[in-house]
Amino acid sequence: MKRLVSDQMVEYLERRNVEYIFGLCGHTVIAFLDALSRSKKLRYISFRNEQLAAMAADGYARIKKKAGVVLCHLGPGIMNTVTGVANASFDSIPMVVIAGDVPSYYFGKHPHQEVNLHSDASQYEILKPIVKRAWRVDDAEAMPEILDKAFRLAESGRPGPVLISVPMDVFSAKIDEELFNRTYKDSPETIKPALAPSAAKAIAKKLIEAQNPVIHAGGGILLAGASEELKALVEFLDIPVSRTLMGQGCISDTHPLMLGQTGFWGLEFTHKFTANADVILGLGTRFAEADSSSWYPGV
């Protein structure tokens, strides 16, 4: 049976256990908001500016450890999300941005607020440099697959934001519900990176041979929900652990093996200890400038 794309999108989000959608109303997303108004599981939180909506979705994702969802209007609406989306990108926070766009039958006719500096209806190019992937849904029947891929990609591997730019008429199109049903079989599953056994063996050998090893933990530990595993590892190996700013909470700062934070806002004691380490195992960190005092030798 054929049903509205917007209604089926809402049902998909419900099945993914999405709780909140953060956004700001615009005429290009009216059909989706209409479908959302009938949901008993999803709550829409409206903001006065899309930047705040994106930042709220970012904060939600950090706490809940799953993708935050942003809904925005075309043109100025999507442009206002840039700072919030970029923040999520740099901190590896999963986010799905659903942006309304001009109707597909108006592409290239210079309709109100169309982004068309380099090509027709190209607003997805605005976020392209700061998202893991950006889609424009040119075919309504592609929506189920794109929406499912978007959540998988946002939450898999190194998490981050993704964008789905949806022409206004696609929300109101009708497609066979079987197309969405196919995504329900395994849609909650995501792919997490795994360490090759040979690499794990090499790391273990280095730690065993080290005289003063240190484990340096970052925000990736929290994103992966691996705090308990990290705690078990450092206690089993009896190796002290330092942390980054984003790694706060990976292990309690009162744990006897916790050295504290490194970098610009780190402790002198921590810096001295890590400077004397002969092997440092970095877990869930990129060794960013703020966490390594501009990569100053010995810090």
Map each language-model feature to its residues.
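N-terminal alpha/beta PP-like core and its mobile active-site loop of ThDP/TPP-dependent enzymes
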Residues: 1-299
